[in-house]
UniProtKB/Swiss-Prot annotation:
Enzyme Commission number(s) from the entry: 2.7.11.32, 2.7.4.27
Disulphides: none
Signal peptide residue numbers: none
InterPro entries according to UniProt: Kinase-pyrophosphorylase, PPDK_reg
Protein name per UniProt: Putative pyruvate, phosphate dikinase regulatory protein
Molecular-function annotations in GO: ADP binding; ATP binding; phosphotransferase activity, phosphate group as acceptor; protein serine/threonine kinase activity
Function: Bifunctional serine/threonine kinase and phosphorylase involved in the regulation of the pyruvate, phosphate dikinase (PPDK) by catalyzing its phosphorylation/dephosphorylation.
Reactions mediated catalytically: N(tele)-phospho-L-histidyl/L-threonyl-[pyruvate, phosphate dikinase] + ADP = N(tele)-phospho-L-histidyl/O-phospho-L-threonyl-[pyruvate, phosphate dikinase] + AMP + H(+); N(tele)-phospho-L-histidyl/O-phospho-L-threonyl-[pyruvate, phosphate dikinase] + phosphate + H(+) = N(tele)-phospho-L-histidyl/L-threonyl-[pyruvate, phosphate dikinase] + diphosphate
Nucleotide-binding listed as a keyword: yes
Amino acid sequence: MSRLHLHLISDSTGETLENIAKAAIAQFDDVEVVRHFWPMVRSESHLDRIMAEVRASPGMILFTLVNGELRSSLERRARMLDLPTVAALDAVTDALSRMLGQEAKARPGRQHVLDAAYFARVEAIQFTVAHDDGIGWENWEQADIILAGVSRTSKTPTSIYLANRGFKTANIPIVPESPPPSALFNLKRPMVVGLTTGLDRLVQVRRNRLLSLNQAPETSYVDDERVKAELAFARRMFADNGWPVIDVTRRSIEETAAAVIKLVEDRASA
């Protein structure tokens, strides 16, 4: 089976870009696509952070950026890495421009009707980006969802996916030597969901991560006994607090997010 890293970079919520990617990927069999989702990209500093991740997981870049300078910067950086870039809406926009006899207006997210739902998604994405990896725990009560789990259990990409569906999502790494803030155990509004995974898969994912960063592949971070202890510690915490748990071992980001959303909806209807 072929494996492809696909980086989706958008200056808006990225919903249009994601739908295009899904439709295109569905045309191919026996391909494992690892999607990296980057919404609300509107500055060079944000692009700097993204390109660091692209370097670590090189692959195809599919984008919708209407800012000319940002777009040129992305394309230039991709060429330096010898990576292909595809502007998802260019062909359609160019055809419409020729037919209508007018230039398209370069405005980020112009394809969206600026209604309450759209603004809610934007707000959710901004909240989620600002509350990644345990940051901003003082504001957790404002969240809809808190994802907890050991390192490399897909907390961040799942959070971003949920944010694109309008859920303010924070996430917190569970580390035995560094207990989470006590606020995590006293939340009223958010639903806290534990993410776990199989030992073998987690060790492999972590080892691949170290290799992509050119770091020593044999450390306690990938030691079987150490990782097993981390998973057990996290599971005990989830059980002690009555938090629902989702095993992400064989789930895509979309499937994990769908399971989280169902938990939220079930609680709301209870």
